[in-house]
Amino acid sequence: MNSKPFFAPIDHTADVGYRLFAPTFAELFAVAGRALFDAITELDSIQPNLERKIEVEADDIESLLVAWLSELNFYCITQLELYCDFNIEMISPSAVRATVRGEKIDPTRHVIHTEIKAVTYHELFVRETENGWEAQVIFDV
Protein backbone atom coordinates (compact mmCIF):
# COMPACT_ATOMS: atom_id res chain seq x y z
CA MET A 1 0.00 0.00 0.00
CA ASN A 2 1.04 3.57 -0.61
CA SER A 3 2.23 5.18 2.65
CA LYS A 4 0.38 8.40 1.81
CA PRO A 5 -3.39 8.68 2.29
CA PHE A 6 -5.40 8.55 -0.91
CA PHE A 7 -8.87 7.91 -2.27
CA ALA A 8 -10.17 6.32 -5.43
CA PRO A 9 -13.64 6.60 -6.97
CA ILE A 10 -15.55 3.35 -7.37
CA ASP A 11 -18.27 2.51 -9.86
CA HIS A 12 -21.70 2.66 -8.31
CA THR A 13 -25.06 2.88 -10.04
CA ALA A 14 -26.70 6.30 -9.61
CA ASP A 15 -24.56 7.28 -6.60
CA VAL A 16 -20.94 8.29 -5.99
CA GLY A 17 -18.60 5.97 -4.09
CA TYR A 18 -15.01 6.08 -2.87
CA ARG A 19 -12.45 3.66 -1.46
CA LEU A 20 -10.25 5.36 1.12
CA PHE A 21 -6.75 4.34 2.20
CA ALA A 22 -4.50 5.80 4.91
CA PRO A 23 -1.70 4.70 7.21
CA THR A 24 -3.52 5.96 10.34
CA PHE A 25 -7.11 6.21 11.57
CA ALA A 26 -6.85 10.02 11.76
CA GLU A 27 -5.53 10.28 8.21
CA LEU A 28 -8.40 8.08 7.02
CA PHE A 29 -10.86 10.72 8.23
CA ALA A 30 -8.87 13.51 6.58
CA VAL A 31 -8.80 11.65 3.25
CA ALA A 32 -12.54 10.93 3.61
CA GLY A 33 -13.17 14.68 3.81
CA ARG A 34 -11.09 15.21 0.69
CA ALA A 35 -13.07 12.52 -1.13
CA LEU A 36 -16.38 14.17 -0.17
CA PHE A 37 -15.31 17.51 -1.60
CA ASP A 38 -13.74 15.84 -4.63
CA ALA A 39 -17.22 14.54 -5.43
CA ILE A 40 -18.64 18.06 -5.11
CA THR A 41 -16.02 20.15 -6.95
CA GLU A 42 -12.37 20.32 -8.00
CA LEU A 43 -10.30 20.12 -4.81
CA ASP A 44 -7.55 22.29 -6.31
CA SER A 45 -10.04 25.15 -6.73
CA ILE A 46 -10.65 25.42 -2.95
CA GLN A 47 -8.50 27.85 -0.97
CA PRO A 48 -8.07 27.49 2.83
CA ASN A 49 -9.31 31.00 3.68
CA LEU A 50 -11.73 30.21 6.51
CA GLU A 51 -11.63 27.83 9.44
CA ARG A 52 -14.33 25.80 11.17
CA LYS A 53 -14.19 23.48 14.20
CA ILE A 54 -15.99 20.16 13.73
CA GLU A 55 -16.81 17.70 16.53
CA VAL A 56 -18.91 14.55 16.18
CA GLU A 57 -19.58 11.45 18.25
CA ALA A 58 -20.99 8.04 17.37
CA ASP A 59 -21.36 4.53 18.74
CA ASP A 60 -18.84 2.84 16.41
CA ILE A 61 -16.23 3.63 13.77
CA GLU A 62 -18.57 3.17 10.80
CA SER A 63 -21.16 5.50 12.32
CA LEU A 64 -18.38 7.95 13.22
CA LEU A 65 -17.27 8.14 9.58
CA VAL A 66 -20.86 8.73 8.45
CA ALA A 67 -21.37 11.39 11.16
CA TRP A 68 -18.10 13.13 10.22
CA LEU A 69 -18.89 13.28 6.52
CA SER A 70 -22.52 14.22 7.17
CA GLU A 71 -21.41 17.15 9.36
CA LEU A 72 -19.03 18.39 6.65
CA ASN A 73 -21.80 18.06 4.07
CA PHE A 74 -24.23 19.91 6.39
CA TYR A 75 -21.93 22.95 6.48
CA CYS A 76 -21.41 22.72 2.73
CA ILE A 77 -25.17 22.86 2.14
CA THR A 78 -26.22 25.31 4.87
CA GLN A 79 -23.22 27.66 4.95
CA LEU A 80 -22.16 27.23 1.29
CA GLU A 81 -18.65 26.26 2.36
CA LEU A 82 -16.15 23.98 0.64
CA TYR A 83 -13.20 22.46 2.52
CA CYS A 84 -9.78 21.32 1.35
CA ASP A 85 -7.72 20.96 4.55
CA PHE A 86 -8.66 18.62 7.40
CA ASN A 87 -6.61 18.76 10.60
CA ILE A 88 -7.73 15.89 12.85
CA GLU A 89 -6.89 17.08 16.37
CA MET A 90 -8.41 14.17 18.32
CA ILE A 91 -9.89 10.88 17.22
CA SER A 92 -11.11 7.74 18.98
CA PRO A 93 -13.45 4.93 17.89
CA SER A 94 -16.40 7.07 19.07
CA ALA A 95 -15.40 10.74 18.56
CA VAL A 96 -13.51 13.06 16.26
CA ARG A 97 -12.53 16.70 16.68
CA ALA A 98 -10.97 18.62 13.82
CA THR A 99 -10.28 22.02 12.34
CA VAL A 100 -11.22 22.22 8.68
CA ARG A 101 -10.21 24.96 6.28
CA GLY A 102 -11.76 26.10 3.07
CA GLU A 103 -13.86 28.91 1.69
CA LYS A 104 -17.34 30.04 0.71
CA ILE A 105 -18.55 28.76 -2.63
CA ASP A 106 -17.55 31.19 -5.37
CA PRO A 107 -19.56 30.45 -8.54
CA THR A 108 -16.88 32.19 -10.64
CA ARG A 109 -14.23 29.68 -9.50
CA HIS A 110 -16.02 26.57 -8.24
CA VAL A 111 -17.72 24.25 -10.68
CA ILE A 112 -20.16 22.16 -8.64
CA HIS A 113 -20.21 18.63 -10.06
CA THR A 114 -22.90 17.26 -7.78
CA GLU A 115 -24.77 17.92 -4.56
CA ILE A 116 -24.46 15.21 -1.93
CA LYS A 117 -27.92 14.45 -0.53
CA ALA A 118 -26.66 12.04 2.13
CA VAL A 119 -23.77 9.92 3.31
CA THR A 120 -25.08 6.36 3.31
CA TYR A 121 -24.44 3.13 5.18
CA HIS A 122 -24.83 1.20 1.90
CA GLU A 123 -21.72 -0.97 1.35
CA LEU A 124 -19.96 1.03 4.08
CA PHE A 125 -16.94 -0.44 5.82
CA VAL A 126 -14.03 0.84 7.90
CA ARG A 127 -11.25 -1.56 8.80
CA GLU A 128 -7.69 -1.73 9.95
CA THR A 129 -5.35 -3.71 7.73
CA GLU A 130 -1.71 -4.72 8.00
CA ASN A 131 -0.89 -1.61 5.93
CA GLY A 132 -3.04 0.90 7.82
CA TRP A 133 -6.72 1.70 7.38
CA GLU A 134 -9.19 1.42 4.54
CA ALA A 135 -12.83 2.31 4.12
CA GLN A 136 -15.55 2.53 1.53
CA VAL A 137 -18.32 5.11 1.48
CA ILE A 138 -21.23 5.77 -0.87
CA PHE A 139 -22.79 9.23 -1.27
CA ASP A 140 -26.43 9.59 -2.32
CA VAL A 141 -26.52 12.23 -5.05
For the regions a protein language model found, what residue spans apply to each?
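N-terminal intrinsically disordered, cationic/polar leader segments
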Residues: 1-141
